[in-house]
């Protein structure tokens, strides 16, 4: 499996049954860059068989900066215009650009609905030396109504020291997934028709905090120390 980290801190799994991580919890507007390591290196923990994806969070830039992004989205499948995305951020550096502060919030509501088609065929008895006609046994038409409501917040504090940096980053991401399924089942073999309805709600919360100290002592010698906290909660 692969490992997901934020500023070098392992992001806790968001799935209760495996080690997978839902990377949609991280807004693209919070990122300065992405580091991809295909195989483990000597400076990394040996707790992953695959590669590592490290999301690098933004830091405040010199001068006062503010940014607002608004998006309105029309969904043609559901014929709705209620989807939106709002991003607001503010940042500045103080004391001759030594101290930096950055805060950002990201609000998003998206319709992820879809239509699914499932079918089953029979060709019994299936022999390798013969060609049998296929018979259509059943078909399932499903209308899947999905809605994702996400809230992300980010706070980054950093201070420049001689040949180094001390920083704190706090990421809090919440997403609520509502899904309702309406299925129309055509059981052709028994000449029957069934209707099924199902509903599911999934609330995911991810928190990641990191204190980091970096300093270059000599041209070929540097020190890097950090303490971190990572948590995920999945209610369904």
Give the predicted meaning of each segment.
Residues 79-181, 204-219:
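Transmembrane beta-barrel wall of Gram-negative outer-membrane proteins
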